[in-house]
A protein has these predicted regions:
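A residue-identity detector for tryptophan
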Residues: 1, 53, 138-140
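Short catalytic/ligand-binding loop motif for oxyanion handling, primarily in non-cytosolic enzymes
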Residues: 3-4, 46-50, 110-113, 131
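Active-site metal-binding loops of divalent metal-dependent hydrolases
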Residues: 1, 43, 105-107, 126-127
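His/acidic metal-ligating clusters that form di-metal
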Residues: 5-105
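Binuclear metal-dependent phosphoesterase catalytic core
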Residues: 80, 88-96, 108-178
Length: 178
């Protein structure tokens, strides 16, 4: 699965899944409409791995359930380093219909965004300095992902490279007063 590399990344545990399921059901029932949510995690779910390879194996073409939005797959070989264990978290999100996007990192050179089964799956830019030798000098994968949430529950995202010494930002730097 991972080109000979054994993945030992921990999967999300059952208590998290139960808590998510139990918290969203009453919230969704209160107003008789689905409460929209976003999920933020560090290690991508196994479905990110599956969706990515489905996209690649389909000649990098969209399918009915899978849409490429933007970004690059900068990691070599294994590309998506997820847990091998299917936690059922993604299936719960699809079933509840409330989680519209999930955001994760972990794979420092990836910044691609896919939509899979109605959920946006999104790598952010890397903000570290020690993951790989000289990563602080590369620049292209450094920055942030802007998430703009709208009052109707929809959202939009964009990646911005804030590597100030090398690239011009899209917007002026904000003055910070302390």
């Amino acid at each position: 699965w991972y080109s000979g590399v054994v993945s030992t990344y921990s999967a999300y545990n059952k208590s998290l899944l139960s808590a998510m399921d139990e918290a969203e059901k009453p919230a969704n029932a209160e107003d008789f409409e689905t409460v929209k949510s976003l999920l933020f995690i560090h290690i991508p779910l196994v479905e990110v791995h599956d969706a990515y390879w489905e996209y690649v194996n389909n000649g990098r073409q969209n399918t009915e359930e899978l849409k490429y939005i933007r970004g690059n797959d900068g990691e070599s070989d294994r590309v998506v380093c997820s847990s091998k264990q299917d936690t059922m978290l993604f299936e719960i999100m699809v079933q509840l219909g409330s989680t519209k996007g999930m955001f994760y990192g972990h794979d420092h050179l990836n910044n691609f965004v896919l939509e899979y089964k109605g959920i946006q799956m999104s790598y952010g830019y890397s903000i570290d300095y020690f993951a790989y030798a000289d990563i602080d000098k590369w620049g292209y994968q450094r920055g942030c992902q802007m998430i703009i949430c709208h009052s109707d529950g929809s959202f939009e995202t964009r990646h911005e490279n804030y590597y100030q010494d090398k690239y011009q930002p899209l917007y002026e730097k904000e003055a910070v007063k302390m």
